[in-house]
């Protein structure tokens, strides 16, 4: 057989977290969550230069533009907060209910940034065996419009007056809900933990009136967590799962699922069996995609793609493990930084340093007759009959020209 000539751009994947300094920089919030009770999953928000973090002890903030800034207690002191939404001077906060009682006191409204607040939990929630709210989503252009998902009596509820009145949209009990940021008539709900071994995903294209099941588009037992939306192409979405990365190019109508252990490469077990809960397209360069997750008995991990989610680097891991399960609560972006909120701390990661550590580019020309080559879907290719494109060869991504 005539040797196949390859013009190869090799992207060398580094195997460790630390190449040039510490990649995961702890911000030292000083409030650990080593004991996960129920579904307590506090969230964070970036407002201008200020990071706001929900904790089991209230709402805290830090000025990200000032490296010397200290954490400040904003409000809701001593209250375990799941999430919050802001409309002008008002904050609507979701209190986590450790007691699993349905007596209310889990929807709090403040008019002064959380220094004082009142319980505005409506009777509709007290009368429906609802113990707390799993999640909250705010409309991207109408801040008084919110979605919440309830537990254990399932339901997605919508308010258009910042929590004064609510309307039930469905009986689902999702882990994640959200509006499409560029087309908020599109609403999604997904249950990352799977339901009866099926990957639970519903999408509404009319503001929650009609919901379409998308289970058949996804592998069983794959999981699907919070969806990230491309910043310029509204049709492109991406989400992590368990063992999988899920993508769609048509507004969620059809999905492609990439199994992360398909390739015969040395990091497949490091990406396998991780709950990849949070994904993000880079706000400035959406070819760069980030995925954060954790799992029982594993470090918190972060992986990166530089080709829009087609291929992924070997996961980087957070080097300070304090709990048997390093659960990841949230991931946000701020300028050139990723912010990851886990049980042990809030971590800051330089995007440029992450990309630099992910790939080192060398241009060489090589001839390999017996090289084992796979396409990006993990299928073994027959050497000598390859069209131009991207492939995996010897644990490296190569471009054949």
Model-derived segments and spans:
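Trp- and S/T/G-rich repeat-edge/linker motifs of beta-rich repeat architectures
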Residues: 22-39, 66-79, 115-126, 164-172, ...
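Beta-strand-rich domains and repeat architectures in extracellular enzymes and scaffolds
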Residues: 32-57
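Repeated scaffold domains used in trafficking and secretory/extracellular systems
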Residues: 38-45, 78-86, 129-137, 173-180, ...
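Entry beta-strands of beta-propeller and related beta-repeat scaffolds
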Residues: 49-53, 89-93, 142-148, 183-189, ...
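Blade-level signature of beta-propeller repeat domains, shared across WD40, Kelch, NHL, RCC1
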Residues: 324-357
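C-terminal outer-membrane/trafficking sorting elements
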Residues: 358-401
């Amino acid at each position: 057989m005539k040797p196949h000539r390859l013009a190869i751009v090799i992207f060398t994947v580094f195997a460790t977290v630390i190449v040039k300094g510490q990649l995961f920089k702890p911000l030292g919030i000083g409030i650990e969550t080593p004991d996960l009770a129920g579904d307590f999953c506090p969230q964070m928000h970036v407002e201008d230069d200020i990071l706001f973090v929900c904790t089991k002890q209230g709402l805290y903030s830090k000025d990200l533009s000032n490296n010397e800034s200290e954490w400040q207690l904003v409000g809701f002191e001593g209250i375990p907060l799941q999430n919050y939404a802001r409309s002008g001077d008002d904050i609507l906060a979701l209190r986590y209910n450790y007691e699993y009682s349905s007596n209310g006191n889990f929807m709090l409204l403040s008019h002064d940034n959380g220094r004082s607040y009142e319980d505005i939990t409506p009777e509709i929630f007290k009368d429906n065996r609802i113990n707390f709210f799993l999640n909250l989503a705010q409309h991207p252009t109408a801040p008084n419009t919110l979605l919440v998902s309830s537990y254990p009596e399932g339901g997605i509820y919508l308010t258009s007056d910042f929590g004064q009145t609510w309307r039930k949209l469905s009986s689902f009990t999702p882990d994640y809900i959200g509006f499409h940021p560029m087309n908020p008539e599109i609403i999604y709900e997904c249950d990352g933990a799977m339901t009866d071994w099926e990957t639970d995903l519903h999408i509404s294209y009319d503001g929650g009136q009609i919901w379409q099941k998308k289970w058949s588009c996804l592998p069983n037992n794959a999981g699907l967590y919070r969806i990230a939306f491309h910043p310029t192409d509204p049709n492109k979405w991406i989400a992590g799962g368990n063992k999988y990365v899920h993508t769609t190019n048509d507004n969620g109508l059809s999905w492609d699922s990439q199994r992360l252990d398909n390739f015969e490469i040395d990091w497949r077990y490091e990406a396998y069996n991780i709950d990849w809960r949070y994904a993000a397209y880079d706000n400035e360069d959406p070819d760069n995609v980030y995925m954060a997750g954790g799992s029982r008995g594993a470090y918190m991990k972060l992986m990166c793609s530089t080709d829009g989610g087609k291929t992924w680097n070997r996961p980087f891991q957070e080097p300070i493990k304090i709990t048997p399960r390093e659960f990841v609560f949230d991931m946000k972006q701020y300028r050139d930084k990723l912010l990851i909120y886990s049980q042990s701390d809030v971590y800051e990661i330089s995007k440029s340093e992450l990309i630099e550590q992910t790939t080192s580019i060398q241009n060489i020309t090589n001839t390999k007759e017996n090289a084992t080559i796979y396409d990006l879907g993990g299928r073994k290719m027959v050497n000598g009959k390859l069209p131009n494109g991207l492939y995996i060869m010897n644990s490296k991504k190569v471009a054949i020209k």
